[in-house]
Design a protein with these regions (language model features):
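Glycine-rich, flexible N-terminal cofactor/catalytic loop recognition
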Residues: 1-66
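A contiguous loop/helix-start segment that scaffolds small-molecule binding in enzyme catalytic cores
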Residues: 10, 86, 165, 172-287
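Generic beta-sheet signal
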Residues: 12-16, 85-91, 139, 164-168, ...
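Short active-site oxyanion
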Residues: 34-40, 113-117, 165-166
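General beta-strand structural signal in soluble alpha/beta enzymes
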Residues: 42, 118-121, 168, 193
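Conserved helicase motor
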Residues: 65-71, 145-148
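Glycine/small-residue-rich loop that forms an oxyanion/phosphate-binding "nest" at active or ligand-binding sites
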Residues: 74-123
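Class I SAM-dependent methyltransferase SAM-binding "motif I" and its flanking Rossmann-like core
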Residues: 104-162
């Protein structure tokens, strides 16, 4: 007897969001599609197999698709779709392509006029900011910052002048280093560290960055993938010294702009005295 819940899918690329922790955090539509597609391209086939087993989906044809084989696997998947197959893409957790593999595949699919179907669902970034208590009307998702200290610091200096709420991903091994770098560059801003979201040991560490650092430093170890939400920079008035410095340093990178012009631009942006900012510009310029 035919399964009444089984659906017939058109050939195409289905971008399917999966749970970020709790295996029940998946949409009914996603389950129907995972059950019906010809192939599932999975970042971690073993993890996906557990998800399918939990929801009693049998007979799925899994294909590994991750950072290390993305280049070679992409044309193969496009070819399968061209020949009439339906292919679902899933990451280990959350929405595919959001700090996960898949960009090359989508780019090639667009170039080949392949049908692309989003199947939305869980996202750690959205889950974290929704419970952060920080402004949610406008935000910047940065994902994972560079692992090398120099490149990471450079990016943080660029972000120090960002007014919108910032969202970062980081591994438990490196999250304390990231927190310290952000505090050094951006000042002691409010933030929220979300850990093990939707799982048994779900935790949210809130407060100034210094307080979050202190809490984590007192622990013997940190477990679980982490999402860090940080307050954006001040818009007017009392600007953190680190934010002001980062803004000036960005201006100094433009060799064609005069020191006076840099001071005028920064002063206007933050509602500060031009003379005060000009003094800072001169001081930072002399340090370089």
């Amino acid at each position: 007897m035919d399964d009444p819940e089984h659906i017939q899918l058109e050939a195409g690329l289905y971008i399917v969001a999966t749970p970020i922790g709790n295996l029940d955090d998946i949409t009914l539509r996603a389950l129907k599609i995972l059950k019906a597609v010809d192939f599932i391209a999975a970042e971690d086939t073993r993890h996906t197999a557990r998800l399918l087993s939990h929801h009693r989906i049998k007979g799925a044809r899994l294909i590994s698709y991750h950072d290390h084989n993305e280049t070679n696997r992409t044309p193969e998947l496009i070819d399968r779709i061209k020949r009439g197959s339906s292919v679902a893409v899933v990451s280990k957790a959350g929405t595919p392509l959001i700090s996960d593999p898949g960009y090359r595949l989508i780019k090639m699919a667009v170039a080949h006029h392949t049908r692309i179907i989003p199947v939305p669902g869980a996202s750690a970034a959205i889950a974290a900011i929704s419970v952060s208590g920080l402004p949610t009307d406008s935000f910047v998702f940065e994902g994972f910052l560079p692992r090398t200290k120099g490149n990471r610091i450079k990016r943080l200096k660029e972000l120090a002048v960002e007014k919108r709420t910032l969202i970062f991903y980081e591994s438990p091994r490196r999250v304390l280093t990231l927190l310290k770098d952000i505090q050094t560059i951006m000042g002691d801003r409010p933030g929220v560290l979300s850990r093990e979201m939707t799982k048994i040991y779900e935790e949210f560490v809130r407060g100034k960055l210094s307080a979050i650092i202190s809490t984590l430093t007192d622990r013997s170890g940190i477990r679980g993938e982490c999402t860090l939400v940080v307050m954006g920079g001040q818009i007017k008035g009392d600007v953190a010294e680190t934010t002001l410095r980062a803004e000036i340093e960005l201006g100094l990178q433009n060799r064609d702009e005069t020191l006076s012009a840099i001071a005028k631009t920064v002063a206007k942006k933050y509602g500060l005295s031009k003379n005060r900012v000009y003094e800072e510009v001169l001081r930072i310029k002399n340090e370089q």
